[in-house]
Amino acid sequence: MQNEYSQFEQRKRDHIELALMPANQSSELNPFDHFSLVHEALPDLDFKDISIQSIRFNKPVEKPFIISSMTAGHSNAIEINYRLMEACSKTKWAMGVGSQRRELTDKQAAFEWEPLRRDFPMVSLFSNLGIAQLIDTPISAIQRLIDTLHAEALIIHCNPLQECIQPEGTTNFHGCWAALEALVKKINSPVIVKETGCGFSKNTLLRLNNIGVAAVDVSGVGGTHWGRIEGHRADKDPIRHRTADTFRNWGIDTLQSTHNAISLNPSFEIWGSGGVRNGLDAAKLFALGATTVGFAKPMLEAALDSTDQVLTQMNTIEYELKTAMFCTGSLVLDDLKEKACP
């Protein structure tokens, strides 16, 4: 078991390093440059009156942003997550934690969050578990993950391509829909289903709507591509390495995934992430109908430096969003829905 934990920690450290490599970014497939907002030369409003308040789980939130789930369960993660949570405590951003998979078998792993929760009790956190682990885990154990973290909700992440390429991947997803439906019915928290960079089809989103998930984070192609990351890790496995190259552009982009969701007029909230790099990208997702927008790589890069760098990144994104709103004559986020170029 100890050897398994050591491999887990090394994998997570690899992920941090590889996620920052330009070769593992599907930026050439990023759709945001092909989508525009209508410029308003005479916006009849005062910049300081612009509100970026949104709704999350039927409650108003001051900021519509979340730091997308990134890393947990290893020593390097503690300082990274401390800086992220410290910044969130000052900006009122929400945060998804890295996978809590290790906490299911290692009780000590849960202690990673205790000092962070003690220092930053007001930060809105979301628990996180992979769909493959959901299938085999009792709901009572998942509820403990949420309760221990004092989390607002639970993210279930879906990563089929990553699992196929990852040398240690778990590729048995049989029973995932039944497990997800049971979770939604029995868990005492909102459930968010999230991709990890490959997006969602309309048919999958329709099924998610039918089982009653609270939100879907579309996380489409355009940012960090986990198939490419695992391909680098599988450099000594010629089959997986070649497969990673074959599927280097696999997935549905973030804007198309968001459009797929909007077209259903779903009961779930639509969260946008995947290649979102600035406040203008975020504005375009809000214009499509997203209510929350997530950032991962920009925050990871900043957190590797300092809390101040994370705060600078957050404040810049907020200012960019408000600039997009001012230059389209949008006083509130909903106004952006009328400002998308046809």
Curated annotation (Swiss-Prot):
Cofactors (names): FMN; NADPH; Mg(2+)
GO MF term (any one): magnesium ion binding
One of the Pfam families matching this protein, by short name: FMN_dh
Cellular compartments per GO CC: cytoplasm
Catalysis: reaction(s): isopentenyl diphosphate = dimethylallyl diphosphate
Subunit comment: Homooctamer. Dimer of tetramers.
Protein name: Isopentenyl-diphosphate delta-isomerase
Highest taxon of source: Bacteria
Keywords: Cytoplasm, Flavoprotein, FMN, Isomerase, Isoprene biosynthesis, Magnesium, Metal-binding, NADP
Protein task: Involved in the biosynthesis of isoprenoids. Catalyzes the 1,3-allylic rearrangement of the homoallylic substrate isopentenyl (IPP) to its allylic isomer, dimethylallyl diphosphate (DMAPP).
Principal location: cytoplasm
Places the protein is found: Cytoplasm
GO biological process, one term: isoprenoid biosynthetic process
Binding-site list for Mg(2+): E163
Gene this protein is translated from: fni
Binding site for substrate: R11, K12, S99, Q100, R101, Q162
Positions bound to FMN: S68, S69, M70, T71, S99, N128, K194, S219, T224, G275, V276, R277, A296, K297
